[in-house]
Amino acid sequence: MLIKKNALSILKIVFPIAVLLFVIYQSKKELTNLSFKRTLMVINGLERTDLFMLVLIGLLAVAAMSLYDYVLKYSLRLSITNGKVFRVSWIANSFNNVLGFGGLAGVGLRMMFYKEHTKDHKALVKGIAWLTSSMLLGLSVFSIFVAARVLPVDEVIHEKPWLWAVVIGFALILPLSLAVSKIKDRKAGDEENADKVKNPIFAYIGASVVEWLMAGTVIYFALFAMGIHADIRYVFGVFVIAAIGGMISLVPGGFGSFDLLFLLGMEQLGYHQEAIVTSIVLYRLAYSFIPFILGLFFAAGDLTENTMKRLETNPRIAPAIETTNVLLVVQRAVLVRILQGSLSLIVFVAGLIVLASVSLPIDRLTVIPHIPRPALLLFNGLSLSSALILLILPIELYKRTKRSYTMAITALVGGFVFSFLKGLNISAIFVLPMIIVLLVLLKKQFVREQASYTLGQLIFAVALFTVALFNYNLIAGFIWDRMKKVLRHEYFVHSTSHITHATIMAIIIVPLFFLIFTVVYHKRTKPIGEKADPERLAAFLNEKGGNALSHLGFLGDKRFYFSSDGNALLLFGKIARRLVVLGDPSGQRESFPLVLEEFLNEAHQKGFSVLFYQIEREDMALYHDFGYNFFKLGEEAYVDLNTFTLTGKKKAGLRAINNRFEREEYTFHVDHPPFSDAFLEELKQISDEWLGSKKEKGFSLGFFDPSYLQKAPIAYMKNAEGEIVAFANVMPMYQEGEISVDLMRYRGDAPNGIMDALFIRMFLWAKEEGCTSFNMGMAPLANVGTAFTSFWSERFAAVIFNNVRYMYSFSGLRAFKEKYKPEWRGKYLAYRKNRSLSVTMFLVTRLIGKSKKDSV
């Protein structure tokens, strides 16, 4: 059974690919003598009235497909407006015509939109599945006409009589569907509430017949526009054969398979190949591509960010359909990205239109002929700049930022005005205002203040700018070289120097444009959270509790973010467009999900990427739910004070150290705040001597700050002369029975083992104070990122992390703490899946090395 299922899945992948390869091979043979350039010239020479009528019929054909959705609405009694049904239908069907595998592209879209309008999702799944399968019923009706010779195809398939079996097979779909529907009606007749979903089979048959009739009309009119006045019965017969081939091929939209079969069929009837190919191109434009572009407009308007999140996180884009099909998974990914980026795609097309208008010859005599030539050249350079901005901007427009909206409107208006002033361009004059109006209507979708760019996105933007500018020079230069002898001077703006001037202007204007908007919106954006407030922090930690890193909030180099219920707190710093949260939330555990969700939402809205530094294993599942990956930074050493003792054979080394310092009359002291200035000054001298030429670190590491040291007790060792030789500040963990340590510093002439002696005495003191656990701080693992199976990103991140110049040797730290036989607990970095781990680690180490004023 499993082997059969795997074989079927493989066949579903291989079959469409094989069909595509066959179509490509066969098309190459058939179209060897065809000039695509000549085809475009023929289309360009057609009567505008014929083109308009063809596009209108194509739009009406796609609109007619909304009958399916209206049948679905009334059969399931969906509480949705007719206008919304029409838009959903247009999006689903136009995307189906381009991307659909036998109608599956529309299944997920319909499910996503309609599930909000019914409580019976099971009935909706069945209804959509019924709708999708009913799209074959109309083709089955026409197949019956073919089999009955009402639509003659004998001349087309006389060389391949086996095709009759395929036609008859499709003809049988209608009676079989009617039979199955009748059986279901009988079974449902005995069930309670059986009339809830009425049998819409005949309504679907009518809708399907209208769909295929309209589609056939489009291609018939395309042939008519090319001067092929064929018998409509023969055209529809060939159309039905080609449509069956397109459906069987499973190729998205039937591209290639339908087109090739229709071409071969019409050639069998004696019509000229070039005219047929041009007709097929016109058919695709009118029935597929133009409705698809209009579908993008509808999608951009109807698909809000929340809707897209539901689609993207939906584990099954096509419920009740086998989701293990790799083709469906790939199609789902493509469909989601196209829908989410529909507006970006439209703006990108606008950029291409403006770029084309800049590259092509300009007829100066048609619009504003009295503009001075220097001004005309200025407008040309500004048009090029607008085009390049519109090509780059979709990267940020995809993120729906307010800045991208303003920039897009500015660039579109600029592109329209400058294109108009420098010369007549039909596409720019008619298309750009439509896109501007669309953007204005969708203004409410742009809710984010800013958006952070990944390194890859920045590189892509620069590469796109460079390639577009290069292509402008290439195309415009080619046109100038080929056409300068043909066009009169007054009709032409371009020359080699004009192209160079426009390029230089764009190189200056485009970066300046982005810089200005970045600065303006950066100043408008209010910072997240609030500045460090020691009094509020102390009150919060004493009431709600904290963790091993909460006390570092008193350093003043981090901002605070409180949950809306006031029961949870995050400490964080900022580096570039990253917000680095130190440790897990402090406060009541029940409010951790709330504070994380609120913080991440606000950071997302203001364009920041968030990472969490030194989180514990206990809450990793919570971060994973928010889409985070993890990298193990190291481990914290916890000494169990209940079992800590200096007695026994295994503790002989520690006992010897303690006894030596007692013999040498070293004394241990713990003082509580407030501390005198003289005491802190003495500690400052020790700290400066210990630092030497090194710079203080911060964020996750304490630094010598009098106000910070006044917040907790300080333990120190004095020699026989009464001089302080080493000290460490006690760091409360705001958890019952737990205590930690932060700064650990000693004089340069302190004897060996002084820090061991200090720790031993601190353990004994903490035990007397009723503490049960002593946190000695974090030490990295020597093998993090060095295993053979580690990813390269982890290896590189480990190199960065382990070689930053901290106060202590990391390998020495671990060896120092290991002698106390602690329990090691993992510490992790939580970072976004779409962010570079190496870059993230580099930014974290930079943040740790920043000064206090630069971190908040």
Swiss-Prot record:
It is found in: Cell membrane. Keywords: Antibiotic resistance, Cell membrane, Lipid metabolism, Membrane, Transferase, Transmembrane, Transmembrane helix. InterPro entries: Acyl_CoA_acyltransferase, L-PG_synthase/AglD, LPG_synthase_C, PG_lysyltransferase. GO terms for biological process: lipid metabolic process; phospholipid homeostasis; response to antibiotic. Its main location: membrane. Pfam families: LPG_synthase_C, LPG_synthase_TM. Disulfide bonds: none annotated. One of its GO terms (molecular function) is aminoacyltransferase activity. It catalyses: L-lysyl-tRNA(Lys) + a 1,2-diacyl-sn-glycero-3-phospho-(1'-sn-glycerol) = a 1,2-diacyl-sn-glycero-3-phospho-1'-(3'-O-L-lysyl)-sn-glycerol + tRNA(Lys). It is a multi-pass membrane protein. GO terms for cellular component: plasma membrane. Its EC number is 2.3.2.3. Disruption phenotype: Cells lacking this gene lack lysyl-phosphatidylglycerol in their membranes. They also display an increased sensitivity to the antibiotics nisin and daptomycin. Cells appear normal, no effect on flotillin cluster numbers or size. The chain crosses the membrane at residues 7-27, 51-71, 88-108, 128-148, 161-181, 208-228, 235-255, 280-300, 342-362, 375-395, 420-440, 459-479, 501-521. Catalyzes the transfer of a lysyl group from L-lysyl-tRNA(Lys) to membrane-bound phosphatidylglycerol (PG), which produces lysylphosphatidylglycerol (LPG), one of the components of the bacterial membrane with a positive net charge. LPG synthesis contributes to the resistance to cationic antimicrobial peptides (CAMPs) and likely protects B.subtilis against its own CAMPs and against those produced by competiting microorganisms (bacteriocins). In fact, the modification of anionic phosphatidylglycerol with positively charged L-lysine results in repulsion of the peptides. Belongs to the LPG synthase family. This is Phosphatidylglycerol lysyltransferase. It comes from Bacillus subtilis (strain 168). The gene is mprF.
